[in-house]
Amino acid sequence: KMAEQGIEDERVFYDPIVLPVTSQQDQVQGCTLFMQMVGDLAPESKSNCGLSNVSNGAPEELRPLLNRVYLAMLMRSGLGAAIVNHAETELVDMARGRRDEELKLVHRVMDGEEPDMGALSQEAVDVVKTTRLLMGQSLYSHSWLKL
């Protein structure tokens, strides 16, 4: 329809709704998959999302980790832009490419790698567990990091 109306792909932003992992865990994977498909649907288009929606309803201390890991996952899936809380410095660092090791760890888990959890720092273990959670490989509970 866009082409019929003379609207070029590069003028279009896709903005799928990001639903909370706390209540719509399966929809988190749906948004990730949609981001992967945008490039096939309209190669020159752009994508955007309200990133922090993914952590709505989670305890405040866990929201930054959920947001940061989901950003890494969506970046891998082709995300072009995101509405984020600029006060979350680690999230901003991730977006600007200053958390490269964490980004690579998320991507390796997305690729199916099973890291040696005993050899990882606690922060890296939390990233692995959160990636698996957002991929739907474990069920959400406020205590997912303790399992």
Regions found by a protein language model. Name each.
Residues 119-147:
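Terminal or standalone catalytic/regulatory effector modules within metabolic enzymes
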Residues 1-119:
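Catalytic alpha/beta core domains of metabolic enzymes, predominantly
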